[in-house]
UniProtKB/Swiss-Prot annotation:
One of its GO terms (biological process) is positive regulation of apoptotic process. This is Dual specificity protein phosphatase 6. Residues 176-203 are annotated as: Disordered. The active site is at 293 (phosphocysteine intermediate). It comes from Mus musculus (Mouse). The gene is Dusp6.
Length: 381
């Protein structure tokens, strides 16, 4: 098969594109000297990508540094294994970059685009770099068998589809304990109150200010550089085991990652002291701190409530109610609530008498000691 090569001018360089047919042939042949780089936003990559591709989404702050020429391409990878793979192979492999749809890329801004900038930088570093004509959308339309999709296809056909999060179209699975597929960190727009009634869909689109320096948010908030700058956030507490710290290599943010999934077996309370210390460090430096998990309604809420309990000497109920007044769709899993009850006892705090109307009793256990607790409704409206 003859590969179609099309010259694409940018700056003073000449880039070459590869066709989707050529790429399909290389994948069919099992070409091990092929390095695919997906230049789309991470949520699109997580949703679906060409097999074996590694993601190289570029935040605005790092794009500016790349334009200035003082940042190597390897620094753009958020995962160590991707960075190592690129470093080992970029000098010998054929590097092919793709975005969502690059068929008209050469007619637009050329070197001002992300593809143009990356191609020039890769060639400057001695790589044999090309871009994929038509991008991911064209390849997926013609050769879907060589695309990896993160939708859960194991559900019975008779079962209704589960909610799909806005973060890259990841489908939530109720029978998986993995972080991304946890049914407990569910779509905020589908959250329900303690009586099962739907909460308002008019939830804040930005992180919620709990205290003047403390913000509660979701994964999307942690990737929005404009939002982080607007709220003066320089510290980011990531309460997930596998969501990347997107701006870690930029050097302008301090991260702490708590590797906890939203599952009944997880002991989040063991991380309370270091999480509280991290938040206090941000406060001491007059910086904003964002506490986030995936959907911003379970793990990050638990940590935020624990912080309020310790620093403001509040009972679990009172601290929970403060957070709920700020963000009505919070919903920590019951075992995390049990750990907060343990934490309340450790702090020597006690909840005041609750005069609210009784609701059906709920029970949960904590993974640390397997005690069983009876819980009244913690939701106040």
């Amino acid at each position: 098969m003859i590969d179609t090569l099309r010259p694409v001018p940018f700056a003073s360089e000449m880039a070459i594109c590869k066709t989707v047919s050529w790429l399909n042939e290389q994948l069919e042949l099992g070409n091990e000297r092929l390095l695919l780089m997906d230049c789309r936003p991470q949520e699109l990559y997580e949703s679906s990508h060409i097999e074996s591709a590694i993601n190289v989404a570029i935040p605005g702050i790092m794009l500016r540094r790349l334009q200035k020429g003082n940042l190597p391409v390897r620094a753009l990878f958020t995962r160590c294994e991707d960075r190592d793979r690129f470093t080992r192979r970029c000098g010998t492999d054929t590097v092919v970059l793709y975005d969502e749809n690059s068929s008209d890329w050469n007619e637009n801004t050329g070197g001002e685009s992300v593809l143009g900038l990356l191609l020039k930088k890769l060639k400057d570093e001695g790589c044999r770099a090309f871009y994929l004509e038509g991008g991911f959308s064209k390849f997926q339309a013609e050769f879907a068998l060589h695309c990896e999709t993160n939708l859960d296809g194991s559900c019975s056909s008779s079962s209704p589809p589960l909610p799909v999060l806005g973060l890259g179209g990841l489908r939530i699975s109720s029978d998986s304990s993995s972080d991304i597929e946890s049914d407990l960190d569910r779509d905020p727009n589908s959250a329900t109150d303690s009586d099962g009634s739907p909460l308002s869909n008019s939830q804040p689109s930005f992180p919620v200010e709990i205290l003047p320096f403390l913000y509660l948010g979701c994964a999307k908030d942690s990737t929005n550089l404009d939002v982080l700058e607007e709220f003066g956030i320089k510290y980011i507490l990531n309460v997930t085991p596998n969501l990347p710290n997107l701006f870690e290599n930029a050097g302008e943010f301090k991260y702490k990652q708590i590797p906890i999934s939203d599952h009944w077996s997880q002991n989040l309370s063991q991380f309370f002291p270091e999480a509280i210390s991290f938040i206090d460090e941000a406060r001491g430096k007059n910086c904003g701190v964002l506490v986030h998990c995936l959907a911003g309604i379970s793990r990050s809420v638990t940590v935020t409530v624990a912080y309020l309990m310790q620093k403001l000497n509040l009972s679990m109920n009172d601290a929970y109610d403060i957070v709920k007044m700020k963000k009505s769709n919070i919903s920590p899993n019951f075992n995390f609530m049990g750990q907060l009850l343990d934490f309340e006892r450790t702090l020597g705090l006690s909840s005041p008498c609750d005069n609210r109307v009784p609701t059906p009793q709920l029970y949960f256990t904590t993974p640390s000691n397997q005690n069983v607790y009876q819980v009244d409704s913690l939701q106040s409206t």
